[in-house]
From Swiss-Prot:
Gene3D superfamilies: 2-enoyl-CoA Hydratase, Chain A, domain 1. InterPro entries: ClpP, ClpP/crotonase-like_dom_sf, ClpP/TepA. This is ATP-dependent Clp protease proteolytic subunit 2. HAMAP family: ClpP. The keyword Ribonucleoprotein does not apply. Belongs to the peptidase S14 family. Its EC number is 3.4.21.92.
Amino acid sequence: MSNTFATLPVMAGDDVPAGPVDPIFNRLLKDRIIWMGEEVKDDMANRICAQLLMLAAEDPKKDIWLYINSPGGSITAGMAIYDTMQLIEPDVATVGLGMCASMGQFLLSSGTKGKRYLTSHARVLMHQPSGGIGGTATDVRINAELIMDMKKTMSELTAEQTGHTLEEIYRDNEYDHWFTAQEALDYGFVDKLVTTPDTIGNNQQGE
């Protein structure tokens, strides 16, 4: 049987994880900041889900801040993060910087509405899922059906997050669609651009 899994295409980049066990990142957790700075994979998703649950248990009323600089990756791993964000009580504010591509884009726009931020020189990429095709004809058909189902689910959620129609999302994610920070704001992926330290600093400190 073919071991094929649907993914969102990953943009080329450094394969070295962004220091998930580094003391600096652990220190950020004390301020309720989670750093997502690598390809979305199962081990990374498990870590972020655990951090979300831990911070929610520590204070269910205080916002959690998810910083995203990611080329995308596994849909199933990304959806585990998404589902955890929806299940916990605290609002999850998202801050995109650098590149938010594929699943990185989806998680950025999945933050609590009104609390989705993007730095002024960040870039956002939206496109549809893809998967490796191999194995028997039945395997190929099953994998294709899985990809189409995931495309529908993610497109429906993205339409809800951005205020666009499903038809508009299907049109715009058919091929690689890059957005500047301003274009991402206009499209509805985020609610505000980060132009000064106070843009998000006051929100983090004033909860």
